[in-house]
Structures are given as structure tokens and as C-alpha cells.
């Protein structure tokens, strides 16, 4: 299913270390030629210090050749640099191992106060911060993400937000936690990084747009692994104008992930309201991006094309199975998508043949009847089954005037937001220049 693979698009906005899990996934799925993937890994590794990993990949790619001299020499250089940095950093790390320092770090949020404490008790100096940062970055480039995360934490609590490496250290800490699959810590770092980007008054609008675009892509790792991720992704991508604007302007392919999060959301009431807002965005962006997942929503909620929706649902399975971020959502997606088809069909018809429903849901009549019985039993559906006639008779779910007013108000607010974003989007398009220099750097933290 290479036609719908987004790895190349997404990789443009990731640190090179974050691309490795995606390539490993593609290798397992056998979507691409294995040699092409190995070449890709080797290219990514060329600007890192993961020399042993690079040697392993080289052996897999060229089994009959010796490891190049350049790689062997690079390994010697990296080991020497690591030893030197370890020697420089060792006395600094010992300061942080002091129990009193640990207590101070846990109790105070004032980095200046902590710095003064370390200076008074241990002779800590300003240049030690640069040493700590360089060592953390070197550890990261070697693939030692736990070490990088630890030293970046020390660095972060000591430096002010105005420090030249402050923002970079936040990116590095987030990447390290993602690569160690520490999802709670990664969610905290993601929130902290978002607040820093949103409150940054120094960056130009274009730089802020670029930062948010990177954050959107990095956040996929967290949102599709953290228990609260599918709620948070909706709040960030759909209901925060600056991030929705970034998606529409820079990366409409992210609509695949937003749509999946909405469809698989476990809060039924929230899901129904959010769907209405999502449909408007999908319609608006359909000329720039579409895939079976967004087209499924369009077929069902815009065109009311049930046959088209059923066809797209079958295609969705292939897309989900071959998407690194969405493969774990497959069962929830199929279950809820069937429910959406059923609910939409039922709004149009009061009495429905079970055999017709089975056809629309791509199930046997027996499976469809059992599925509907479970929905009724779990209070997710107001309906009765007439087993003799093989019909489902829908109940009457009248919406209160109060609820109608609320929904219309929400709809108006959302339309106003969309109008404002379209104006901003046109202004951004007219004033766009080259991306900030760090966006082109894909080694280290960013």
C-alpha cells in the first residue's frame, strides 16, 4: 500500500533519530524493497554518532565487503570524543548526585536559585551549562537516549527560557523520551514545548508556524501511544486555531491522523459533535489532501453514499495496517466506522432490513444481527429487532430545543473560526519566505 504511505512526507518534519522506528516498521511490512530501506538507514546514520549501528546496516547491505576505513576511523574518533566529554562532565554530574541538590531540584522552580545554590556549595560555573548541553547532545547522537534525557533535564531546570540552547534542549528531551517510549514523560515534555512555542514573542510568525508544524508531527508518537492521546490530539489539531492553521497551510496530510482520532474516540457524545466540525475541515481541504480515511468521512457525512463508504472502509483497513502510527487503531476504527454507517443509515430510514444492513456493513446477516443486539444491550442504540420479519425498528430520538440551540451556537463559533483562519492562511501564503535555518538541520535535536 505504498500509494498511501506518508513516511516520506512525515520524515521531512522529524529529527533523523525519530525516522528510524518508521523505517523499521516499513521493513517489517515489506512495503518497499529491503535494500532501498537499508540505503535509507545508512544515509540517516551518516550524520549521527551511532557508528556500530551504521556498521551493522553496512554488513546487511554489503555482506561480501569489508567495513569502510572511514567508518572505522569515525568510530575511533567518536569513542575518543565521548571519553573526553565524560571526563569534563563527571564532576558536574557528581554535583547533581548530592542529596541536598536533589531536594533543591524537586522543591524549587526557580532555576536561578538552584544555580546559586550549586555555585555556593559546589563551585558551579556558567560554562558548566554548555558542557552539560554538549554532553547531552553527544549522548543523543550516539543513541544513548536515557543519558541524553537525564542531562537535558539537569540543563533545563538550570537555564532561563532566554538561553540560546533552551528551546533546542526541549526538543531533545522530547525526542529522547519518545525514543525510550516513556509516554507520560513525553506528554509532559510535549506540553512544555508547546507552551514555550506559543508564548515565544521573539520568533517571527513564519518561525512560529514552522515550530508548530514540527510539533504536530512529533506529537503523533505521543498521541497514538498515550492513554489520553486521542482526546488531546483532537483538542490541539482541531480546536486550537494556530495548529489547525499550520495543518491547513503546511501539512494537510495530518488530517488522516486527526480523522482517525475522532473516529476511534471512546466518548460517544464528544465524537458526534466533533465529527460535524471535522467534516467541515475535510471538505475545505479535500482539494489539497485526501485518502481512504478522509474520503470515508466525506462519503458518509457529505454525500450520504453508503456504497462508497463501505468501499472506502475496506481500503481504510489497508491504510491503517500499513501506517506506523495507526496500526494499533485498526479494531477500534472498523468497529466505530461500522457504527457510523449504521447510525447515518438509521437517521434516513425508520425501519431497516437486517440483510440490507449486513450488506452495508460488510457482514453476514447473522453477524449483523448479533452486532445490533450488542449495541442495544449496551445502551448505545435505541431500537428493537423484529426477528420474524428480519427488521430493525428505530426508536424516536428527539433532540431538545435547548440542545439544538447549543449545537447551532457551536456551529456558528466554528464557522467564524474557520473564516478567520482562511484570512490568516491567505496572508501567510502571500508573505511566506524560506523556513528558518534550524528546520533544515536534521541531526541532533533539531
UniProtKB/Swiss-Prot annotation:
GO biological process: formation of cytoplasmic translation initiation complex; translational initiation
Cellular-component GO terms for this entry: eukaryotic 43S preinitiation complex; eukaryotic 48S preinitiation complex; eukaryotic translation initiation factor 3 complex; eukaryotic translation initiation factor 3 complex, eIF3e; nucleus
TM region(s), chain numbering: none
Every PCI domain range: 222-399
Major localization class: cytoplasm
Subcellular localization: Cytoplasm; Nucleus
PROSITE patterns linked: PCI
InterPro entries in the record: eIF3e, eIF3e_N, PCI_dom, WH_DNA-bd_sf
Alphabetical keyword list: Cytoplasm, Initiation factor, Nucleus, Protein biosynthesis
One Pfam assignment: EIF3E_C
GO MF term list: translation initiation factor activity
Taxonomy, superkingdom: Eukaryota
Assigned protein family: Belongs to the eIF-3 subunit E family.
Function: Component of the eukaryotic translation initiation factor 3 (eIF-3) complex, which is involved in protein synthesis of a specialized repertoire of mRNAs and, together with other initiation factors, stimulates binding of mRNA and methionyl-tRNAi to the 40S ribosome. The eIF-3 complex specifically targets and initiates translation of a subset of mRNAs involved in cell proliferation.
Record note on quaternary structure: Component of the eukaryotic translation initiation factor 3 (eIF-3) complex, which is composed of 13 subunits: eif3a, eif3b, eif3c, eif3d, eif3e, eif3f, eif3g, eif3h, eif3i, eif3j, eif3k, eif3l and eif3m.
Record HAMAP family: eIF3e (MF_03004)
PANTHER family xref list: EUKARYOTIC TRANSLATION INITIATION FACTOR 3 SUBUNIT E
Protein's UniProt name: Eukaryotic translation initiation factor 3 subunit E-A
Amino acid at each position: 500500500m505504498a500509494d498511501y504511505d506518508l513516511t516520506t512526507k512525515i520524515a521531512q518534519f522529524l529529527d533523523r533519530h525519530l525516522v528510524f522506528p518508521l523505517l523499521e516498521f516499513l521493513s517489517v511490512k515489506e512495503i518497499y524493497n529491503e535494500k532501498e530501506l537499508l540505503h535509507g538507514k545508512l544515509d540517516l546514520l551518516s550524520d549521527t554518532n551511532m557508528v556500530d549501528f551504521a556498521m551493522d546496516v553496512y554488513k546487511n547491505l554489503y555482506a561480501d565487503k569489508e567495513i569502510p576505513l572511514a567508518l572505522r576511523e569515525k568510530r575511533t574518533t567518536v569513542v575518543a570524543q565521548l571519553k573526553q566529554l565524560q571526563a569534563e562532565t563527571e564532576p558536574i554530574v557528581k554535583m547533581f548526585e548530592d542529596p541536598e541538590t536533589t531536594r533543591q531540584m524537586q522543591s524549587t522552580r526557580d532555576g536561578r536559585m538552584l544555580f546559586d545554590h550549586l555555585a555556593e556549595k559546589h563551585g558551579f560555573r556558567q560554562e558548566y551549562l554548555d558542557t552539560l548541553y554538549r554532553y547531552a547532545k553527544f549522548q543523543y547522537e550516539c543513541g544513548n537516549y536515557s543519558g541524553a534525557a537525564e542531562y537535558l533535564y539537569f540543563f533545563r531546570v538550570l537555564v532561563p527560557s532566554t538561553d540560546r540552547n533552551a528551546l533546542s534542549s526541549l526538543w531533545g528531551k522530547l525526542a529522547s523520551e519518545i525514543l525510550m517510549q516513556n509516554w507520560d514523560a513525553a506528554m509532559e515534555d510535549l506540553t512544555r514545548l508547546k507552551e514555550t512555542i506559543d508564548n515565544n514573542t521573539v520568533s517571527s510568525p513564519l518561525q512560529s508556524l514552522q515550530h508548530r508544524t514540527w510539533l504536530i508531527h512529533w506529537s503523533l508518537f505521543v498521541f497514538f501511544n498515550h492513554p489520553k492521546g486521542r482526546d488531546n490530539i483532537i483538542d490541539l489539531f482541531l480546536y486550537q486555531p494556530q495548529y489547525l492553521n499550520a495543518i491547513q497551510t503546511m501539512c494537510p496530510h495530518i488530517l488522516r491522523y486527526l480523522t482517525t482520532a475522532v473516529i476511534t474516540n471512546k466518548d460517544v457524545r464528544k465524537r458526534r459533535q466533533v465529527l460535524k466540525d471535522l467534516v467541515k475541515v475535510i471538505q475545505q481541504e479535500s482539494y489539497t489532501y485526501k485518502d481512504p480515511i478522509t474520503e470515508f468521512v466525506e462519503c458518509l457525512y457529505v454525500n450520504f453514499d453508503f456504497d462508497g463508504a463501505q468501499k472506502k472502509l475496506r481500503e481504510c483497513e489497508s491504510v491503517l495496517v500499513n501506517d506506523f502510527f495507526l496500526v494499533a487503531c485498526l479494531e477500534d476504527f472498523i468497529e466505530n466506522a461500522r457504527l457510523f454507517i449504521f447510525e447515518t443509515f438509521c437517521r434516513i430510514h425508520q425501519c431497516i432490513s437486517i440483510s440490507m444492513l449486513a450488506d452495508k456493513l460488510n457482514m453476514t446477516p447473522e453477524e449483523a444481527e448479533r452486532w445490533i443486539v450488542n449495541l442495544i444491550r449496551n445502551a448505545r442504540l435505541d431500537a428493537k429487532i423484529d426477528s420474524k420479519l428480519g427488521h430493525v425498528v428505530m426508536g424516536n430520538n428527539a433532540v431538545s430545543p435547548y440542545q439544538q440551540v447549543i449545537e447551532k451556537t457551536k456551529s456558528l463559533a466554528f464557522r467564524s473560526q474557520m473564516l478567520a483562519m482562511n484570512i490568516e492562511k491567505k496572508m501567510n501564503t502571500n508573505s511566506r519566505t524560506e523556513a528558518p535555518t534550524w528546520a533544515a538541520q536534521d541531526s541532533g535535536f533539531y
